[in-house]
A protein has these predicted regions:
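Active-site-proximal loop/turn and secondary-structure-junction residues that shape catalytic pockets
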Residues: 9, 34-36, 61-64, 105-109, ...
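Active-site acidic/histidine proton-transfer and metal-coordination neighborhood
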Residues: 74-173, 183
Length: 273
């Protein structure tokens, strides 16, 4: 497995600063957030080559089909605009040769489950077609059940696989976010029996302190992260472990990019033995 760091973990730095710091820390790959990319893709690719980084997975500028309920990340309200943006991101991000490009459903936000599901299935089919045209793997990310009203109405591995089955999209993978799925009973069976469906891994831990909504480095919480790494290794899965830390301003996000990258590498390296 390769080791990667997702750019949201160093939200206050630029793409160029991320690339330099992640490479200097010893990461193999970067998890790109499209909103951080400068417009010149050729220059961006040259910078990645210069520093020897590959791309783990990409998060599109508009990552959900239905509008997010996270303050500051809502984006357009119209699902049609969101789907068109998601398809455009597939075409742009293909140049970076990522392991996958992810999407989430978004929350229902007052829609009936049937109405929301119909919109999402249409969006997934169109995004998958756009991904197929440029040889990109689309990955659907479930979110933890506590984020049903803000992030996604797909809150388990079973939900995600059922949605993809209903959409007729068996080629679409799953983005396994350990923070979201560490307590899903189906996690271990997915890794052991169907690791080929895992198109990417986001890696963070669930804090030990009750009431916290941020994430901590792998190995610092209660999320059985070492067991996940061992299970992935046993299954033969060989993608990137992409450390992804959503933080509070005075916690992990307060670190300078170089220090954040070093801390993240030390944490994930300790689990990959």
């Amino acid at each position: 497995m390769k080791l990667a760091l997702s750019e949201i973990s160093t939200v206050n730095s630029t793409f160029a600063e991320d690339v330099a710091a992640y490479a200097a820390a010893g990461f193999d790959a970067i998890g790109i957030w499209e909103f951080k990319l400068p417009d010149d893709d050729e220059a961006n690719l040259a910078l990645l080559r210069q520093h020897g980084l590959t791309v783990a997975n990409c998060v599109p500028t508009v990552p959900t089909i239905l509008q997010l309920g996270i303050p500051g990340m809502e984006g357009p309200a119209d699902p049609e605009i969101r789907i068109e943006g998601l398809c455009a991101s597939m075409r742009r991000l293909a140049a970076y040769d990522p392991e996958s490009v992810l999407c989430l459903t978004g929350p229902l936000a007052g829609r009936t489950p049937d109405d929301g599901r119909a919109i999402v299935i249409d969006g997934l089919r169109r995004a998958a077609a756009a991904a197929r045209e440029v040889d990109v793997t689309l990955a659907l990310e479930p979110a933890h059940r506590t984020q049903r009203e803000t992030t996604s109405f797909v809150n388990s591995i079973e939900d995600a696989l059922a949605l993809l089955h209903d959409a007729g999209l068996d080629e679409v993978g799953l983005l396994l976010d350990v923070y979201h799925l560490w307590d899903d009973p189906a996690l271990w069976d997915l890794i052991a029996r169907a690791s080929y469906r895992i198109a990417g891994v986001h890696f963070a831990d669930w804090p030990t302190e009750a009431g916290r909504t941020d994430r901590v480095l792998p190995g610092e919480g209660v999320g059985r992260t070492k067991e996940v790494v061992d299970a992935l290794a046993l299954s033969g899965w060989d993608g990137s472990l992409d450390v992804e830390i959503f933080s509070e301003p005075d916690r992990f996000w307060a670190h300078p990019v170089d220090e954040a990258a070093r801390r993240a590498l030390a944490a994930v390296s300790a689990l990959v033995v």
